[in-house]
Each structure stands twice: as structure tokens, then as C-alpha cells.
């Protein structure tokens, strides 16, 4: 999770987030190189007394500044498209979790099991236990198994919401009347926090998301207790 004075992203806890971090570094390096080149050219123009006011045609220069941007765009577009297809690809998920956004809480339903659904509200400050995080703790955490492909079905009962867990690289809009889907898979156990990322009313900032990812053995034990 994020911590005070943090610079950069949270630690990646899913293959998708790892790919997004690599893509961010890749794109940032390209931006850095372009910025350095532009600053170098500007410094040369300001420091030299020579000017080319009589230049009427420069075919080589025009060719370079046409081809080079095209190559740069291709270098950005190809890995971006690869990640885009990875995020949309859902092959034989192990289970499905349906999420509905409300003003101002989330409700969850494990569609593979009968009568396993609950609402998840933020725990108010007076009710926090020692060690709980203010404005991030909920009364009912989502328990899921690690290292398994999970299909998320996300929608809303009222207004626009957005179900977001940064460490897992997930941000999917919850739209009334529309069912969006996303893939969730973690590489390690842990507790991951998120929040609604679409302004949805006066209590928009009080819609935390808490996922508790556990090994399959412990998930099955929790499942038996909940059913």
C-alpha cells in the first residue's frame, strides 16, 4: 500500500501491474531522451552566433523529423497494445466475483457459490481497532485465493463509480446498466487497499476497498465457514 512521502508506484502484486511498471519505465526513458535532445538543441541555438537564414530546402532534415517520430510512436504503441490485450484476456477463470457500487459502499457476490454475498462499508474512526488504517478499513474484507485467475464483474446500482486497487493494476469503471469485467490474479498473499476513483457524491472518499489474498487452503477454510 502507499505510505507518506512515497514517490512512484506501489509495489506490484500482480503480473499486469508488473507489466505496467515496465511500460512506465520504458515510456519515461523515451520522454527523457526526447527532452534531453530538445534542451541540447535549444542550448546550441542560444549559445551560437551562427544562423541559417538562407536555408530554403533541407530534404534530409525533413526525412529525419518525419521518420524518427513515427519510430518512437511505434516503440510506444507496440508494448502498450500488448498490455491492453493482456488486461482484456480472460481464459477459463477459476472463479468469478461480482462487485456492485452503491452510494457509498460496495457489495460483493461470489457467483460460483450460493448465498455468498455481503456489503462492505468503511469502518468509521471511533470503531477502528488498533492497527487499522483510517479511511481504508472495511467491516467485510474480500477474501480471495492467490495465484488463481479471478474474473471480476463490476457494475453500479446508482451512479458512476470506479473499482480501483493500485497494487494489482486494476481500475475498472462501475457503470449503471453495464457489466464490465477485469482479470485479477496476485503473485503473493497480502492485504491490498483501494478506493473508488470516480467522483460519485459527497461521501466519494469513504468507499475503500480491501482485498485479503490468501493461499488456497485458507480460502477453502474461510469458504466452509461462510457457506
From Swiss-Prot:
Keyword Iron: no
Cellular location(s): Mitochondrion inner membrane
Protein's organism: Nycticebus coucang (Slow loris)
Reactions it catalyzes: 4 Fe(II)-[cytochrome c] + O2 + 8 H(+)(in) = 4 Fe(III)-[cytochrome c] + 2 H2O + 4 H(+)(out)
A Gene Ontology BP annotation from the UniProt entry: ATP synthesis coupled electron transport
Residues holding Cu cation A2: 196, 198, 200, 204
Quaternary data: Component of the cytochrome c oxidase (complex IV, CIV), a multisubunit enzyme composed of 14 subunits. The complex is composed of a catalytic core of 3 subunits MT-CO1, MT-CO2 and MT-CO3, encoded in the mitochondrial DNA, and 11 supernumerary subunits COX4I, COX5A, COX5B, COX6A, COX6B, COX6C, COX7A, COX7B, COX7C, COX8 and NDUFA4, which are encoded in the nuclear genome.
Cofactor: binding comment: Binds a dinuclear copper A center per subunit.
Keyword Electron transport: yes
Binding site for Mg(2+): 198
Signal peptide start-end: none
Protein's recorded name: Cytochrome c oxidase subunit 2
Membrane topology: Multi-pass membrane protein
Cofactor: Cu cation
Amino acid at each position: 500500500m502507499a505510505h507518506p512521502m512515497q514517490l512512484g508506484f506501489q509495489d506490484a502484486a500482480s503480473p499486469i501491474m508488473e507489466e505496467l511498471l515496465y511500460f512506465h519505465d520504458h515510456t519515461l526513458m523515451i520522454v527523457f531522451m526526447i527532452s534531453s535532445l530538445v534542451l541540447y538543441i535549444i542550448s546550441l541555438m542560444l549559445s551560437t552566433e551562427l544562423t541559417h537564414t538562407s536555408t530554403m530546402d533541407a530534404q534530409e532534415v525533413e526525412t529525419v523529423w518525419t521518420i524518427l517520430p513515427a519510430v518512437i510512436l511505434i516503440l510506444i504503441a507496440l508494448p502498450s497494445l500488448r498490455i491492453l490485450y493482456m488486461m482484456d484476456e480472460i481464459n477459463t477463470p477459476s472463479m468469478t466475483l461480482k462487485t456492485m457500487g452503491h452510494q457509498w459502499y460496495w457489495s460483493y457476490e461470489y457467483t460460483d457459490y450460493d448465498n455468498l454475498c455481503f456489503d462492505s462499508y468503511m469502518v468509521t474512526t471511533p470503531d477502528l481497532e488498533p492497527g487499522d488504517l483510517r479511511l481504508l478499513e472495511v467491516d467485510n474484507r474480500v477474501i480471495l485465493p492467490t495465484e488463481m485467475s479471478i474474473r471480476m464483474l463490476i457494475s453500479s446500482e446508482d451512479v458512476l463509480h470506479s473499482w480501483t486497487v493500485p497494487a494489482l493494476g486494476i481500475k475498472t469503471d462501475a457503470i449503471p446498466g453495464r457489466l464490465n469485467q477485469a482479470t485479477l490474479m496476485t503473485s503473493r498473499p497480502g492485504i491490498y487497499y483501494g478506493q473508488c476513483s470516480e467522483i460519485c457524491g459527497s461521501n466519494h472518499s469513504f468507499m475503500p476497498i480491501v482485498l485479503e489474498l490468501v493461499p488456497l487452503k485458507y480460502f477453502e477454510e474461510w469458504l466452509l465457514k461462510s457457506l
